[in-house]
C-alpha cells in the first residue's frame, strides 16, 4: 500500500498540493505516479484535498489536521484503512509530482529487504548541496543512513582535497517493512535532532533504528516554494509526465 500524506497549509507554500501541474493538481499527479506501482491512497488533512481526489477518482481518506509529521498522518490513514500489521507501507510525498516510477519501484525493492525502513537518495553536485531545502545523507558501509542534514555533509576539511565519496541528496520517500514498524516509529518520543533540523527521519536514527538507503537516478525535484514550482515547470514537459 502506498500512502501520500497531503497537508493544505504548508508553512512555505500554502495550498501547494492543489497547484496545477500541466492540467492536474499536484497531489493528483503524485497519486497517478504511485498508482503505476501499487494501490495508492491520499491521506488528506482538509476537505478541499479530499474533494479534489474524489473528482479525479483518486482514493483518499480524511485525517486529523494536528499531526506533527507526514509519518504520523500515514499511520492514521493506515489505521482508517484497516491495514494488517504485516502489510508493507510506502510513504510518498504530495509535493513530488515529477517522481519517476522507477524510483518508487526501487524503494519498494529496498523496503522488502530492509529490516526496519528504507528510503532513496541520488548523487548531487556541490552547488545543489549548498541548499538547506535539499537534505543530504551520509551512509555506512552497508548503505544504511548514518545521518541526514540540511547542512553540507560530509564537509571537506582540506579545501584542495578531492571527494572520495559522492554527495548524496535525500529523496523524501519512505518504505516501512510492515505497518507494525510504522506503529513502532510513531510511538517513539520526538528527539532534539529532528526538532533542530526539522527532519522527522532523524528520530529513527536517534533510537538506533536502521534506515536502508537505495541510491537511484532521478531528475525529480520536491516543490517547497512557489519559486521551486516555477523552475520545475520550465524544466519538465507534459510529455515527460505521461509515462
UniProtKB/Swiss-Prot annotation:
Query: What is its pathway?
Result: Nucleotide-sugar biosynthesis; CMP-3-deoxy-D-manno-octulosonate biosynthesis; CMP-3-deoxy-D-manno-octulosonate from 3-deoxy-D-manno-octulosonate and CTP: step 1/1; Bacterial outer membrane biogenesis; lipopolysaccharide biosynthesis
Give the UniProt entry's GO cellular component terms: cytosol
Q: Per the record's keyword annotation, is Cytoplasm included, yes or no?
A: yes
Please give the InterPro entries that the UniProt record associates with this protein: Cytidylyl_trans, KdsB, Nucleotide-diphossugar_trans
| Entry EC number(s) | 2.7.7.38
Q: Does the keyword Nucleotidyltransferase apply?
A: yes
Q: Which SUPFAM superfamilies match?
A: Nucleotide-diphospho-sugar transferases (SSF53448)
Superkingdom: Bacteria
> What class does this enzyme belong to in the EC scheme?
transferase
Q: Say which family it is in.
A: Belongs to the KdsB family.
Q: Which HAMAP family match?
A: KdsB
Q: What is this protein called?
A: 3-deoxy-manno-octulosonate cytidylyltransferase
Amino acid at each position: 500500500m502506498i500512502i501520500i500524506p497531503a497537508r493544505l497549509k504548508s508553512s512555505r507554500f500554502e495550498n501547494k498540493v492543489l497547484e496545477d501541474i500541466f492540467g492536474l493538481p499536484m497531489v493528483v499527479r503524485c497519486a497517478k505516479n504511485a498508482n503505476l506501482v501499487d494501490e495508492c491512497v491520499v491521506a488528506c488533512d482538509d476537505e478541499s484535498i479530499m474533494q479534489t481526489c474524489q473528482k479525479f477518482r483518486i482514493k483518499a481518506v480524511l485525517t486529523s489536521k494536528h499531526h506533527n509529521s507526514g509519518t504520523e498522518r500515514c499511520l492514521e490513514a493506515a489505521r482508517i484503512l484497516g491495514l494488517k500489521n504485516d502489510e508493507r507501507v510506502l510513504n510518498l510525498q504530495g509535493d513530488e509530482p515529477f517522481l519517476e516510477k522507477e524510483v518508487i519501484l526501487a524503494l519498494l525493492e529496498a523496503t522488502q529487504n530492509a529490516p526496519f525502513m528504507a528510503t532513496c537518495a541520488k548523487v548531487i553536485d556541490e552547488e545543489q548541496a549548498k541548499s538547506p531545502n535539499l537534505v543530504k545523507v551520509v551512509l555506512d558501509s552497508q548503505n544504511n543512513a548514518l545521518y541526514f542534514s540540511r547542512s553540507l555533509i560530509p564537509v571537506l576539511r582540506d579545501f584542495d582535497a578531492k571527494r572520495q565519496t559522492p554527495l548524496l541528496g535525500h529523496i523524501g520517500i519512505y518504505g516501512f517493512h510492515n505497518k507494525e514498524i510504522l506503529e513502532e516509529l510513531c510511538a517513539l518520543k520526538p528527539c532534539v535532532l529532528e526538532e533542530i533540523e526539522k527532519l522527522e527521519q532523524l528520530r529513527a536514527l536517534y533510537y538506533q533504528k536502521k534506515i536502508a538507503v537505495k541510491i537511484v537516478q532521478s531528475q525529480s525535484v520536491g516543490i517547497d516554494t512557489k519559486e521551486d514550482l516555477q523552475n520545475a515547470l520550465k524544466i519538465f514537459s507534459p510529455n515527460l509526465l505521461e509515462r
